[in-house]
C-alpha cells in the first residue's frame, strides 16, 4: 500500500472521529434503550464532501472492526461454528456460557456507529444516487448480523428519540432487507461502470459494478436464509439475484474490506495473534486433514511443538475439541504450543515454529472477509438442489465454489481439480476426547455424490470451509441447515444445555442492559419470538425451523 493511500486512510479515520460531534450529536439522551437511540428527524445537514467519510465509518463497523471483533464474534460465533477451540482458562464461552457484558459488542455499535452515519447519508443524498443505494446495502449487512444473533431487535423506530423503542419481529425485518436490496439494486444497475465514494469505499474503492454483484450476492444469502420459512419469497429473491448478476470470479469479485494499522483499524483476527487464546478446532482438523485440503496452509500454521515450519505436512497440524474444562485445557495435548495457530496472514513476526518466523510484518493489514465469490456458488448450488433456476446444475455450481475458494486463497486450479475428484472423507483428528474415542467428524466426501441428501451435506461442508474465518455466517448456516459437520461440545457449563449431542445454542438472549434500560420493549419482544418460546439461548430464530 503506497503512502498516498495510507495517508488517505488515516485522514478517513481522523475526519470520521471529528465528525462524531456533527453526526452523533443526535444520540438521544433517553432514559431507556441503553441511551443509544438517535433522532432521525434531527440528523445534521452535511456538505457533500463529508458523506464519503460517513460511509467509510459505517462500512468499518458493519463488518465488525478490531475494537469489537473478539467480544462480538470470536468468543461466540467463531466457536459455535467450530472454526476455533479455546485455550484460555478464563473464558467460558467455548463451554456455551454467554457473557452478556461482551456480546453487546454485536449490538450497540450498529446503533451508535452505523445507523446515524447511514441515516445522515440517506437524508443528504438523492434516493436515486449510487451513494444512497450503497448505503442501503451496508445497512442490510449490519442489521443482518444483529438480528441473526437475537431475532427481534429495535429496527423500524430505531433512530427516533423516545423513552422506549420497540423491538420488531425478524420476519418483518427480513422483508425490509429484501425491500432495501431490491431498491438498491434497481438504482445501481443503470449506474454500472460509474464510481461512488472513491477510495473512501474500503471494499471496492467505489466501483458500482462490483457493488451490484455484492448486493445481489447478499440478497441471495438472505434468500437461502429464509428458504425454510418463506420458500416462495426465497425462490423469487434468489432467482432475481442470479439473473441480475452475483459474484462469479475470485479474487476479482470478492468483497474484502481493507484493514490497516494506520488509524488503528487492523484486521480483527490479526489483533489476537500474540494472545494464544484460540487454536484450530478438532473439527477443522478432521475435515482439512481428511480431505488433504491445501487451504490448511492458508488457514492455520504447523504446531509450535512440531518444530517444523514447513507448510503442507498435514501431520504437523493439530486441533483441539470445543468445550474443554479448565483442567482439560492444561493437559499437554491441549496446550497452545501443541495445536495450530491461525494462519500466516493473521500472525505477527513474533510467531515462530522451530525458530523460524512464520508470521508476516503486514499481518495487521490483512483484508477482512465480508462476502466472497465461493459463497455465491454454494448458495446457488443449494438453490439448484431445491429446483430453483440458478443458471447451472448443483454439481457444476458446487465444483465452481471449490475452485473459486481455492483461487481466493491462492491455491492453483490444478490442485482444485484434483481435490474435486477426490473421494477422501474427514479423518479422526487425534485430538483429546474425554472418553478416549477418536472418530472422524463426518463421512462426507469431496467428490460429488449421487445421493441428494449427501449432496446437501457436501455443499454445506464446502461452504463452511470457504466461509472461514467468518463464524457469524457459518453459525447462521448451522442453525438453518443443521447439516454442518460439527462435534458435540465436550462439556457445557450452561444449565440449559445438558446434552451437547442433541442441544446447541440457537440465539443470544436479549441483553441485560436492554432489560434494565428498555425493559418494557424487551418484555414485549419476548412474544415476538413466537410459539410461546422464552427469551433464552435454546429458542430458535424465525428462520430456524429445525428440531433438535
Model regions and ranges:
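C-terminal functional modules
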Residues: 406-548
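Structured, solvent-exposed acidic/aromatic patches
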Residues: 48-49, 83-413, 449-454, 462
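Beta-strand acidic-aromatic groove motif in beta-rich domains, primarily in extracellular
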Residues: 67-76, 152-153, 234-235, 471-476
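Membrane-proximal, proline-rich intrinsically disordered regions
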Residues: 29-82, 109, 116, 124, ...
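Sec-dependent bacterial lipoprotein signal peptides
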Residues: 1-28
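Short acidic (Asp/Glu) and glycine-rich catalytic loops that position anionic groups and cofactors
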Residues: 34-36, 357, 436-441
Amino acid at each position: 500500500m503506497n503512502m498516498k493511500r495510507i495517508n488517505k486512510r488515516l485522514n478517513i479515520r481522523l475526519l470520521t472521529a471529528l465528525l462524531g460531534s456533527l453526526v452523533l450529536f443526535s444520540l438521544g439522551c433517553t432514559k431507556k434503550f441503553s441511551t443509544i437511540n438517535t433522532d432521525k428527524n434531527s440528523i445534521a445537514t452535511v456538505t457533500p464532501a463529508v458523506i464519503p467519510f460517513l460511509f467509510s465509518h459505517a462500512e468499518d463497523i458493519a463488518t465488525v472492526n478490531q475494537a469489537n471483533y473478539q467480544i462480538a464474534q470470536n468468543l461466540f460465533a467463531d466457536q459455535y461454528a467450530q472454526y476455533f477451540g479455546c485455550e484460555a482458562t478464563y473464558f467460558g464461552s467455548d463451554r456455551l456460557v454467554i457473557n452478556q457484558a461482551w456480546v453487546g459488542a454485536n449490538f450497540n455499535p450498529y446503533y451508535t456507529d452505523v445507523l446515524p452515519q447511514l441515516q445522515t447519508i440517506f437524508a443528504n443524498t438523492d434516493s436515486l444516487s449510487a451513494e444512497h443505494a450503497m448505503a442501503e446495502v451496508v445497512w442490510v449487512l449490519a442489521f443482518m448480523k444483529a438480528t441473526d444473533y437475537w431475532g427481534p431487535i429495535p429496527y423500524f423506530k430505531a433512530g427516533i428519540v423516545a423513552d422506549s423503542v420497540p423491538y420488531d419481529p425478524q420476519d418483518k425485518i427480513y422483508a425490509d432487507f429484501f425491500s432495501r436490496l431490491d431498491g438498491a439494486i434497481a438504482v445501481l444497475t443503470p449506474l454500472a461502470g460509474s464510481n461512488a465514494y472513491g477510495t473512501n469505499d474500503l471494499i471496492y474503492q467505489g466501483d458500482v459494478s462490483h457493488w451490484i454483484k455484492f448486493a445481489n450476492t447478499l440478497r441471495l444469502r438472505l434468500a437461502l436464509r429464509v428458504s425454510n420459512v418463506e420458500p416462495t419469497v426465497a425462490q423469487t429473491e434468489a432467482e432475481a439475484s442470479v439473473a441480475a448478476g452475483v459474484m462469479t470470479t475470485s479474487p476479482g469479485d470478492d468483497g474484502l474490506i481493507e484493514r490497516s494499522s494506520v488509524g488503528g483499524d487492523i484486521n480483527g483476527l490479526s489483533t489476537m495473534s500474540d494472545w494464544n487464546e484460540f487454536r484450530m478446532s478438532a473439527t477443522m482438523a478432521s475435515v482439512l486433514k481428511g480431505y488433504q485440503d491445501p487451504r490448511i496452509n492458508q488457514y492455520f500454521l504447523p504446531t509450535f511443538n512440531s518444530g517444523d515450519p514447513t507448510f503442507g505436512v498435514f501431520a504437523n497440524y493439530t486441533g483441539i475439541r470445543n468445550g474443554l474444562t479448565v483442567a482439560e485445557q492444561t493437559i499437554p495435548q491441549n496446550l497452545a504450543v501443541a495445536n495450530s495457530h491461525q494462519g500466516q496472514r493473521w500472525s505477527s513476526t513474533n510467531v515462530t515454529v522451530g525458530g523460524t518466523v512464520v508470521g508476516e510484518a503486514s499481518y495487521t493489514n490483512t483484508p477482512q472477509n465480508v462476502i466472497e465469490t465461493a459463497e455465491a456458488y454454494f448458495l446457488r448450488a443449494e438453490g439448484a438442489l431445491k429446483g430453483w433456476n440458478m443458471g447451472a446444475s448443483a454439481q457444476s455450481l458446487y465444483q465452481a465454489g471449490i475452485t473459486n475458494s481455492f483461487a481466493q486463497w491462492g491455491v492453483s486450479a490444478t490442485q482444485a481439480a484434483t481435490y474435486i475428484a477426490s473421494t477422501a472423507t474427514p479423518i479422526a483428528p487425534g485430538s483429546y476426547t474425554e472418553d478416549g474415542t477418536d472418530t472422524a467428524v463426518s463421512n462426507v466426501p469431496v467428490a460429488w455424490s449421487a445421493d441428494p441428501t449427501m449432496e446437501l451435506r457436501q455443499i454445506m461442508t464446502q461452504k463452511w470451509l470457504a466461509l472461514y474465518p467468518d463464524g457469524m455466517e457459518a453459525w447462521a448456516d448451522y442453525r438453518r441447515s443443521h447439516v454442518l459437520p460439527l462435534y458435540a461440545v465436550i462439556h457445557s457449563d450452561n444449565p440449559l444445555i445438558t446434552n451437547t449431542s442433541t442441544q446447541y445454542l440457537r440465539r443470544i438472549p436479549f441483553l441485560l442492559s436492554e432489560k434494565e434500560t428498555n425493559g418494557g420493549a424487551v418484555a414485549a419482544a419476548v412474544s415476538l419470538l413466537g410459539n410461546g418460546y422464552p427469551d433464552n439461548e435454546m429458542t430458535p430464530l424465525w428462520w430456524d425451523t429445525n428440531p433438535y
